[in-house]
């Protein structure tokens, strides 16, 4: 266990473990920030005393959860661990670049924390819109540090994306076509393509913001012929694909978990699932301005972005109904990963429906920047991405560690978490419809009831997080070893035992294609 093993590792399993530990730690930081938000909003009146500090917390909560929790766990953690095992590759295509992708994240996190510690912090929201993010409204180094943090996280993700694209296309056995790789591998491939195409645009946007702030350029300043709306277009051209980047690996995970615990050899409609993911990836790039319905776009532009956004519901529906068809007629095993997966399907669908509501530009004019939007994206993230992470973790934990989690405790944990997140976010739909705006630390008394309910829900979720830590400790303390694994011929990641040896597939895998 020399320190060099972890600092200089080129092993996909070790780097995957580093990502998972880092993501879990960041997840606790992000959860702490969210509890500060809910504490402030638990009753009318001021707790933190200052709107600036409140908005710094909101901004940090978003960045930590997106760039340091969901992406490192889903793409870096499970992607690194499972993709090489699932395609029979000895490691990633570029093992040292893989190491660099991980080690860019801690410095990036450090810069984000530093941005909160200098001056007044970056209270811009995660969108970092100018002129609020300009050098008048946010004098000092805070926003600059945030921009540098995003640059590092972006470089990390771009390198990781190159690595995953090369690995999934190039490292599988020659006899295997791309259409014979598991759906999780496909989901990571599509995610990587989205990252590769969208992140450079974000980098351009925040670099121009950096020069506007420090070098007197006027890209986003009307005084010099610039336009703040340009920044919004650049940001959301990245920002919308980003939300699909966050959920697509989750889609892949849910496909695996649902098929496994339905006793099926494969998910229903494999090709439909693959094409649906590719369609979602493509459509995700041509709908960005639905985040900007309130900036004064032409009616025909609004009509296009409304329609295009609604089209995304079709491939998404293909996936949801394919999961239901996979369940159909199966021998259902009611184990904890299946509970998380079923919770995912139900709650992600609810979040998708509120998304369809918001895609209507006329309705969005009213609902934009209210808690209805917050409720919508937390249903697809806090109950989509996070439920997928939990499903993956309890399903693959025996593979990663060789130990099994306590089945009763994990089920109780699921129940507590399910109640907590729903109690937190369902009332926010009511607040949004009643007109409560986002990003304010105080509110009129009329909104008190549902805010209090929401804050109680956040405390229940906190209990669930603490329970999860206990469950983790219990598993490592009890050391129940894995006895046998079912369905290994269609779930090849399990073939090497639990946990697999440090090096797998050191010789090229022999693949025999069975012709019908």
Swiss-Prot record:
E.C. number(s) listed in UniProt: 7.1.1.9
Positions with a binding annotation for O2: 244
InterPro entries: Cyt_c_oxase-like_su1_dom, Cyt_c_oxase-like_su1_sf, Cyt_C_Oxase_1, Cyt_c_Oxase_su1_BS, Cyt_c_oxase_su1_dom
Reaction(s) the record says it catalyses: 4 Fe(II)-[cytochrome c] + O2 + 8 H(+)(in) = 4 Fe(III)-[cytochrome c] + 2 H2O + 4 H(+)(out)
Spans within the Mitochondrial intermembrane topological domain: 41-50, 118-140, 213-227, 287-298, 358-370, 434-446
Enzyme's top EC category: translocase
Bilayer disposition of the protein: Multi-pass membrane protein
Key word Mitochondrion present: yes
The protein's required cofactors: heme; Cu cation
Residues reported in the UniProt entry to bind Mg(2+): 368-369
UniProt main location, coarse: mitochondrion
Transmembrane parts of this sequence: 12-40, 51-86, 95-117, 141-170, 183-212, 228-261, 270-286, 299-327, 336-357, 371-400, 407-433, 447-478
Pfam families: COX1
Crosslinked positions (1'-histidyl-3'-tyrosine (His-Tyr)): 240-244
The protein's annotated pathway: Energy metabolism; oxidative phosphorylation
Residues binding heme a3: 376
Subunit structure, as described in the record: Component of the cytochrome c oxidase (complex IV, CIV), a multisubunit enzyme composed of 14 subunits. The complex is composed of a catalytic core of 3 subunits MT-CO1, MT-CO2 and MT-CO3, encoded in the mitochondrial DNA, and 11 supernumerary subunits COX4I, COX5A, COX5B, COX6A, COX6B, COX6C, COX7A, COX7B, COX7C, COX8 and NDUFA4, which are encoded in the nuclear genome.
Function per UniProt: Component of the cytochrome c oxidase, the last enzyme in the mitochondrial electron transport chain which drives oxidative phosphorylation. The respiratory chain contains 3 multisubunit complexes succinate dehydrogenase (complex II, CII), ubiquinol-cytochrome c oxidoreductase (cytochrome b-c1 complex, complex III, CIII) and cytochrome c oxidase (complex IV, CIV), that cooperate to transfer electrons derived from NADH and succinate to molecular oxygen, creating an electrochemical gradient over the inner membrane that drives transmembrane transport and the ATP synthase.
Protein name: Cytochrome c oxidase subunit 1
Organism: Carassius auratus
Gene name tied to this protein: mt-co1
